[in-house]
Amino acid sequence: MTVRREYPEKPLVGVGGVVIADGRALLIRRGSPPLEGEWSIPGGMLELGETFEEGVRRELAEETGLEVRVVEFIEVFERIFPDQDGRTKYHFVILDYLCAVESGEARAASDVSDVAWAREEELARYALTPTATRVIKRAFAMWRALG
């Protein structure tokens, strides 16, 4: 059974991974709606039978070519995108995790048009959503606390 992303019958569960390496976070430019063309955190939809962490690892490999280790849960939030008539076009519940690179080189792959590594003080130049900015800054703080 295929789940409809547009005009879903119920909220869809997504996962994301904030990958930090060498004091920089990995950003992706979305290649498909919603937020097509905008910079964001890599991630996507959880598949049936997958744990959150398995989903994060799969999505990061698909979108960026990186094999990652999931370090710690960051936060959960929801994104609701209404259409022009006020109907819910997209509704996601997203769990984001702090991740570390195990292997690979970051590259744009599935559903991604570009990748970039950004220091915390450089985030503003990528015009991230307020939620993505908050999550990434929280990930940097967690990374520093881990030493």
Language-model segment annotations:
Residues 1-16, 87:
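Acidic, metal-coordinating catalytic segment for phosphate/diphosphate chemistry
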Residues 21, 29:
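A cytosolic small-molecule/anion-sensing beta-strand core signal
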Residues 34-37:
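A conserved beta-turn-beta hairpin within the catalytic core of GNAT-like acetyltransferases
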Residues 41-74, 97:
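The catalytic Nudix box helix
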Residues 78-105:
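Active-site-adjacent beta-strand/loop module that shapes the phosphate/pyrophosphate-binding cleft
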Residues 96, 107-139:
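NUDIX/MutT-family hydrolases
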